[in-house]
Amino acid sequence: MAASGPGCRSWCLCPEVPSATFFTALLSLLVSGPRLFLLQQPLAPSGLTLKSEALRNWQVYRLVTYIFVYENPISLLCGAIIIWRFAGNFERTVGTVRHCFFTVIFAIFSAIIFLSFEAVSSLSKLGEVEDARGFTPVAFAMLGVTTVRSRMRRALVFGMVVPSVLVPWLLLGASWLIPQTSFLSNVCGLSIGLAYGLTYCYSIDLSERVALKLDQTFPFSLMRRISVFKYVSGSSAERRAAQSRKLNPVPGSYPTQSCHPHLSPSHPVSQTQHASGQKLASWPSCTPGHMPTLPPYQPASGLCYVQNHFGPNPTSSSVYPASAGTSLGIQPPTPVNSPGTVYSGALGTPGAAGSKESSRVPMP
């Protein structure tokens, strides 16, 4: 195996994590980690979750901060997996700048729709609605956009091949298993993603020109310098080029198995057959009832000529070359009028070329 260079990334040691995806998971750990692992149970309600009094008290920051709050270690672990899986794929598709932009947009619109349903539920006395928290609403919004705009017709979910349009709804049902997660907020997030994917809301979209300008500003310029994580450019051409390099890596950038070099087309066929570079002898001409003239002794070619006495008429004969490299050994002499007679060029000599006493080997 060829050894990779010192500057090459080692293969299959760890997957590439996009920059914004990593910092989203890190921010969730910094916000929820101290409350979960340092404070005593039971925990007091967090001041960053999404509640109906958030707008009444002008706590508008809760429209975004709720996606970093987790009230259970299991939900924190599930949230980290969701961020890595769904947010990472979305960032690789749209770029780091647009990923951060859509994270905020999806969080705000999902929160507004959630608060509207919560207000209707409280007025109609349908029951108490659980507070929205965690990254799952934004993840479902990203999944909705990806599902609508994807060209894939089928996808693999839980070991089953299902139509891609059913993937968000199957995962929405599975979100019931995540503890302390608002199912209503997940529905709101999925609705926002599907609506955005179907209508192509250009009014709230971020253009590529603006994304390229933001790539050079803080904090994205600092994120670009961190080589441990993958910063995805806002240019669609650069993303396609990076994807092409990933699918077709440059020769020498990955370990390869050493093997014998193939023969290049520039080598003529005669060089592979003759070590001395000599050309093959021309085919001998033959007239009916006359013995063919054998070529000089050429051990490298191994050519032999077969004379067949059963041509168009009994007295005619035809000569054609036999398979190269086939050897049947020296056999005892046989009658000249045998059905098939082989005149071996390896046994003939230039002096006996015109005589009929050359060696004969019967063909099976």
UniProtKB/Swiss-Prot annotation:
Cellular location(s): Golgi apparatus, cis-Golgi network membrane
Annotated region (Disordered), positions in chain: 242-282, 317-364
Signal peptide: none
InterPro entries: Peptidase_S54_rhomboid_dom (IPR022764), Rhomboid-like_sf (IPR035952)
Gene Ontology biological process: endoplasmic reticulum unfolded protein response; ERAD pathway
Protein name, entry field: Rhomboid domain-containing protein 2
Species name: Homo sapiens
Keywords assigned by UniProt, alphabetized: Golgi apparatus, Membrane, Transmembrane, Transmembrane helix
Domain of life: Eukaryota
